[in-house]
C-alpha cells in the first residue's frame, strides 16, 4: 500500500524539482572609467543544464569593447537521465496502482503479473540508484560552474586590480538539492518493495514448498517409528503380564493333592 501511495508522489517531486528548474546569478564589473562599467550582468540557466551554451557579455574596461563568455560544463546527460527515470517510474507506478485495485484477479493469473512486477521493480531500483548518483555528481558540477567566484575568474577585466568585480546574488539551488533527495528516497522505496513483490511470485511459494517437504518427511518417519515402538511395547507388556499369574491348569491341580490324601486315610 505504501508503494501505491508514495511511488507516484515521489516520482513527481523528483522530476518536477529537477526538470522545472530555472535559475541565474548576477555579477557587477566596476571599471576605473565608470562609463565602461556594468553593475548588473545577469546570467540565466535552466534544465537540462547545457552550461557551455549559456553565453553572456561583460565589459573589458578597455574602451567600449565587450567580451563574450560562456559558462563551463555540460550536465545535460545526467539530468535528462534522472528525469527520464522519474517520468517512466511515475507512469509505471500509476499503471501498477490501477492493476492492483481493479484487476487483482488477472494480476495473479499464471504468476505472470507478479513475475513482471518483480522484474520491473528490480530494474527501477537499479535505475533510481544510478540516476540519483549520476545526477548528484552532475549537480555538484553545476554548482561549481555557476559559482560567481568561478565565473568572475573568466573575465579579463576582473584580472586587473584597479577594477572591482563582485557577485550581486548567487543562484538558488534548493529545489535541485530536493530533487537529489527524492531520487534516493525513490531508490529506497523501490528497493524496499522488492521483497514484498517477490513474496507474490511463484518463486517464493516454490521455495517454501521445497523447505517444507523434507520437514514433513522427517516428521512422518518419526511418527512411524514411535508407532512401532508403542506396538512392540504393548505386545511385550501383554505377554509379560500373562506369564506372571498362574494358569488355569495350575488352579485346577491344587485341590487334587488333599483329595487323594483323604482317600488313603
From Swiss-Prot:
It is found in: Cytoplasmic vesicle, Secretory vesicle, Synaptic vesicle membrane; Synapse, Synaptosome. This is Synaptoporin. GO terms for biological process: modulation of chemical synaptic transmission. It comes from Rattus norvegicus. Residues 210-242 are annotated as: 5 X approximate repeats. It holds the Pfam family MARVEL. Keywords: Cytoplasmic vesicle, Glycoprotein, Membrane, Phosphoprotein, Repeat, Synapse, Synaptosome, Transmembrane, Transmembrane helix. Sequence repeats lie at residues 210-214, 222-226, 227-231, 232-236, 238-242.
